[in-house]
């Protein structure tokens, strides 16, 4: 879960529209004395408080026993036979001193009064009409002044005796709100509901303090946001979530295709791609879980807007929601560990010569997959104990709890270590470039390009998540769009750079495409064997120059003209342009032996001087070569595109590639 999810779902994935209204009105009403940092909001009832007595049933205690021995309490207790009323001086110190005594004890103390028990039994109402229906036909005994019933758009407050501090359980249906705590509403001595503190105007419907309902992490989040324009924050978060879903879908597609490429072609199975594949698997797992949760929340939000009911499949399923978030954090932790392995392996191969000959795959696998299991298990256990999932909140806001640093601490350490690896790798690259006598501008360009390419692979862009500016909506928008663009498209960028734009991968794909086309009846697409080696067999026609027979040092050697292209390549790209005649005879020996057996000879022993090639075979070979050249000449532009990367096809094996060549190739692209 991210800060974006906290702002989107803050106070209620179940009732997003209601919580948006709560935040808007909480911000407009100012801080409360009992919770200076929490939100508060005004009642929406248009009824004027009167001295008429009406009562209906309520679902939670409205009165709270106050310890008379407390020095801050100047109140007295009055027992009129109907209810036990605490006359309290509503000073901030007194409100802070109110104890959170057991609700059942309060109910037990008031059991002797039947009318008051009705008030404490239930007060379930979902709108103004329901609240009105509860109280309009019930009359209290003439025992004193009462504040009239009122509906504050969240709770239905029954008539309350004058001078009483009414407390009602916090409304359900919101994430980040503890329903075991109480919202507070003050009935003044004159029978009117009290306005918010420091208010310049009297508000007849009164004011409800919902500050105590928020959990500590939500209060800290509201402190960070500071601004009162909560609608702007929520709107920015929604647009960012749309951008995030698009990036995750694109990353998922690119990562899956890259995994298929790495697993299909055996020539790509080297040490670097083994690490790449594990990193891609961790990223795919993380993206799939995140998309599942986001789409479930999106579907739930749309349905609630129309029906005001929760249709969430994941959140309303016991253990499924918790398991989803635990798996999400495990996948994220595994992704960071494999990013660390990427940085460690590349750094050691470039800078430490002792690691170049070894590849501890088992150690890397345990570090990348087993260590995150241990970390996630410890975090999940601590979080479940801290959050009390019996409230049905499904680990919501767990990223705001202190236990989240069990996971976030090692991730931050991985980012910092990879940043150090990156700095050292760039230092080595600059040293190599200086030895090549490149210009300063060229050195800087290649170093910066290599650094930019390595940033997503090493996960350094995730460092921006730790720097969330929430003081103003503008700063939050810049941070939100930029950070979530980089993180959601991270998988796409990694797959693009390290798979689709990799020269070796493109060469393998090109060769596979050419082979498939040649098998399907397009011989002109067949890859030439010569392109896989440093030298090539000379297929020039017989009109090519031949060394004079009188020269003993060059007898029997055929030489290609210096400016003639060989097999579609320049002469400078071939290290061998001459083929010895004995080698040709050696290739023809099986044919000569078969011909001798047909004539009935038991054994054929010929030396290089005795063996003569069959002119018929040579004629057939020349004819086939001429036919191939004619077909090639007809589709020259196609062949040029297909085998434009034949130089890349001559990449040596992974073991012989210099360790720093990976970074150099990236800087050249």
Curated annotation (Swiss-Prot):
Q: Which GO terms describe its molecular function?
A: calcitonin receptor activity; G protein-coupled peptide receptor activity; neuropeptide receptor activity
Residue spans of biased composition, Basic and acidic residues class: 595-609
Please tell me in which tissues this protein is expressed.
Mainly present in clock neurons of the brain. Localizes in all 4 s-LNv neurons, 1 LNd neuron, 7 DN1 neurons, and 1 DN3 neuron. In addition to the clock neurons, it is also present in approximately 13 pairs of neurons along the ventral nerve cord in third instar larvae, which do not overlap with dopaminergic or serotonergic neurons. Not present in DN2 neurons (at protein level).
* TM segment ranges: 245-265, 275-295, 335-355, 367-387, 412-432, 450-470, 481-501
A GO biological process of this protein is: regulation of circadian rhythm
Q: Does the keyword Transcription apply?
A: no
Tell where it localizes.
Cell membrane
Compositionally biased region (Low complexity): 26-40
Q: Name one Pfam family in it.
A: 7tm_2
**Changes seen on gene knockout:** RNAi-mediated knockdown in small and large ventral lateral neurons increases total sleep in both the day-time and the nighttime and decreases sleep latency during daytime only.
Question: Is the Amino-acid biosynthesis keyword given for this protein?
Answer: no
CDD domains reported for this sequence: 7tmB1_PDFR
An annotated GO cellular component: plasma membrane
InterPro entries in the record, alphabetically? Answer: GPCR_2, GPCR_2-like_7TM, GPCR_2_extracell_dom_sf, GPCR_2_extracellular_dom, GPCR_2_secretin-like, GPCR_2_secretin-like_CS
Residues on Cytoplasmic side:
266-274, 356-366, 433-449, 502-669
Disordered: region residues: 24-52, 536-573, 590-614
> Keywords of this protein's UniProt record, alphabetized?
Biological rhythms, Cell membrane, G-protein coupled receptor, Glycoprotein, Membrane, Receptor, Transducer, Transmembrane, Transmembrane helix
Q: What does this protein do?
A: Receptor for PDF, a neuropeptide controlling circadian behavioral rhythms. Probably regulates circadian behavioral rhythms through coordination of activities of clock neurons. PDF-binding results in the elevation of cAMP synthesis. Plays a role in sleep regulation and regulates the state transition from sleep to wake.
Name of the protein: PDF receptor
Source species: Drosophila melanogaster
